[in-house]
Regions:
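P-loop NTPase catalytic core of nucleic-acid-dependent motor ATPases
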Residues: 1-72, 245
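Alpha-helix N-cap/helix-initiation motif
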Residues: 15-23, 48-52, 83-87, 102-105, ...
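Short, glycine/acidic-rich hinge or "gate" loops at secondary-structure transitions
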Residues: 39-56, 60, 128-141, 164-165, ...
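Acidic/polar loop patches that form or flank catalytic/metal-binding clefts of enzymes
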Residues: 40-44, 70-76, 124-130, 154-159, ...
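Conserved beta-strand scaffold positions in the cores of enzyme catalytic domains, especially
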Residues: 44, 71-72, 146, 173-175
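AAA+/P-loop NTPase substrate/partner-engagement loops
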Residues: 46, 58-109
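Extended alpha-helical interface modules used as scaffolds for assembling large macromolecular complexes
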Residues: 88, 94-95, 104-107, 111-123, ...
Length: 426
């Protein structure tokens, strides 16, 4: 192929159609080799969504065609994680492209978060030599970006369905989820077909120019990084977004006729597209932040059937039942008791809430939330104490005193079977 034909195809497909979201993702293919001019080893793009024909595969083909064959350059869904790391090491600064991680992610929902974290660390895993008690020399490293496609929306899983905290991984990748099928004219279809005939030429021209102009490249990447940090308001924990967007924008500038003369792209539109993706990710993180109350409510929701519920009856006596509504009777094993709720038992108009500390600590660990932080945060708004509580008191059961977290709230008109924690007036 030749560079002019490649340029015409990109111009017809991306620029004339004003497909700036797709173009921004595609320009990251040039930006990948600029990652070594930042302080970071890697960045991740994910193209997701269940709708077909929206441009995910086209974007991957366009990115692959910058450096090699649009199809054979990228790895397939059957590639093992170790092989992917080896490929990233061999490509070094060229982008790693992974097509269809849907089945891999569904088989192991923790695969993608782990992969995102590992790739942005820039180094393969350490291994031992099979014939000696010593480590192998680990020369599998990289400074590059990776782009993955799937039918999933990773931010939905990592910000909601995932039980563990995902803030670190969420801030190391950006996601594009197109949902409008693309329609093509005959001329545009010819341009799409041309991508499979003219490939590998743009990347070669770009890397040759970068090698000859490293000081100019480094200066522009650093300036772009600083400008985007100010323009997009990147904070310290958003540094990977800053690096990933900076390399893409810098590549969009360096490929212009003012520098390497490869292709002129609308830089401002690309910046707007990147800004939109960053703002979407910020919104996801903002809405997914877990508070101590969220952790407590999650414990209640998952375990309320194992709570002992005591309610004061009209005659002044108390009646005990399980949270699922079944009556409390006969001997009970300790492991079945997951909490205790007392409705107006000790004080009229108040509900007392007890959970064994050991169980609550295990729950906090499972949700990646420090127990000490949990108590401190909860104490900012509610009266929280640690007491020695007989979890079977007033049930005719044996003595069962444990260290328990005690929360007291005012009873409201809400249903008694729900346990929203509300500020307690003191």
């Amino acid at each position: 192929g030749d560079l002019d034909s490649w340029r015409d195809a990109w111009t017809t497909i991306f620029i004339k159609r004003k497909m700036y979201d797709l173009l921004a993702c595609a320009m990251d293919s040039f930006g990948s080799i600029l990652m070594q001019f930042t302080q970071f080893e890697g960045f991740v793009w994910h193209l997701g969504g269940k709708t077909s024909g929206t441009g995910k595969s086209l974007t991957l083909s366009a990115k692959a065609g910058v450096w090699g064959h649009p199809v054979r350059y990228r790895t397939g869904k059957g590639t093992s994680p170790v092989a992917m790391q080896n490929r990233a090491g061999m490509l070094n600064s060229m982008p790693l492209l992974i097509d269809e991680i849907t089945s891999t992610q569904r088989d192991n929902m923790e695969w993608a978060p782990g992969f995102i974290f590992n790739h942005t660390e820039g180094q393969g895993k350490e291994r031992m030599e099979s014939s000696a008690n010593k480590e192998r020399i680990n020369d599998t490293n990289w400074h590059s970006t990776v782009t993955m496609t799937s039918n999933e929306v990773l931010t939905d899983y990592m910000a909601g369905a995932r039980k563990f905290s995902s803030n670190g991984e969420l801030r190391r990748f950006l996601e594009w989820t197109p949902n409008v099928p693309l329609q093509w004219t005959s001329q545009e279809l010819e341009a799409v077909r041309a991508l499979k005939l003219h490939f590998g030429v743009a990347g070669e021209a770009f890397i040759r120019w970068v090698v000859r102009n490293q000081s100019t490249t480094r200066r522009l990447v650093e300036e772009t990084y600083d400008q985007l940090r100010n323009e997009m308001g990147f904070s310290g924990d958003e540094r990977y977004w800053n690096a990933g967007t900076a390399t893409t924008v810098a590549a969009s500038i360096l490929t212009s006729r003012q520098y390497s003369k490869i292709i002129d792209v609308p830089v401002l539109n690309i910046i707007d597209s990147l800004k939109d993706k960053v703002n979407r990710s910020r919104a996801v993180i903002r809405n997914s932040i877990r508070t101590a109350e969220d952790v407590l409510n999650a414990y209640t929701r998952d375990n309320y059937g194992g709570f002992i519920v005591l309610k004061r009856q009209p005659n002044g006596e108390t009646a005990a039942s399980w949270g699922d509504g079944s009556m409390f009777s006969g001997p009970v094993i300790r492991s079945k008791i997951l909490g205790r709720v007392e409705f107006e038992v000790t004080k009229e108009g108040y509900v007392d809430y007890f959970i064994e500390e050991q169980l609550l600590k295990e729950h906090c660990v499972g949700m990646s939330y420090g127990y000490s932080d949990f108590k401190v945060e909860l104490s900012k708004n509610y009266v929280v104490t640690v007491v020695k509580k007989d979890m079977l008191a007033r049930t005719k059961g044996p003595l069962l005193r444990v260290n328990a977290l005690h929360i007291c709230r005012k009873k409201t008109h809400e249903a008694e079977d729900s346990l929203p924690v509300e500020p307690t007036e003191t």
